[in-house]
Amino acid sequence: LFHGHVLNLKNKVDYLFIPRFTSISKREYVCPKFGGLPDMIRHSLNGLPDIIDTEINLRKSNKNAIKAAMEIGYRFTGDTSAIKRAFNMAKESYYKSRQLLKKGKLPDDFKTREKRKPGNNEIDGKILNIAVIGHVYNIYDSYINMELIDKLKNNGVNVITVDMIDEDIINEKTSMLPKRLFWNFGRKAMGSALHMLDRKDIDGIIYLMSFGCGIDSFICDLAERKIRRESDIPFIVLTIDEHSG
């Protein structure tokens, strides 16, 4: 799927931005496959434009974010002030998008004001709230998940994703676990699942799992066991092929 995205873009752009993600938060790691994406693409496809593969590693300090931004910016200009301004504008836009997500908006809602058609989202007068837990690239890529989110929304279901849950709540929930989760996604997924146990408005949970994903294999199992033992919330696991959809 990632190869497909690149093939679609390669003749339309001057650069491909494929950052080498190592860590996006202190003391945590991103899945190693993200660190290998630039090399995978560079050595498997021909005729590519220049690839910007700056490492993003915030494991020790968030200050490394500005270092990465400066490294990228110097490819285009020597104006340090201009790069810093662009970095601050990007941060502001990012924080605004995070706030929209926490208010229950989905990424597709950012680019359109068109209202979805109302569906039959009530059972005995109660609105259905369904939590969808999984990697964001699975949740928000309609090709991979076969338009799962659209199908839910078009039927009037209120969809709740990991991004809509406050980071402090996630950290509080995962702090109760016997061992710290050092994968960024694992912490968020598990914390979100545990948070659902406290909510009285959740009617069901869908765990969108990648076939062959090591993190998913144990986080999903832990979450499912916990929820089935301590609640009567319906829990379903949808396993998809992240390579082909």
For each predicted feature, which ranges?
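An N-terminal assembly and electron-transfer interface module characteristic of large anaerobic redox
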Residues: L1-G245
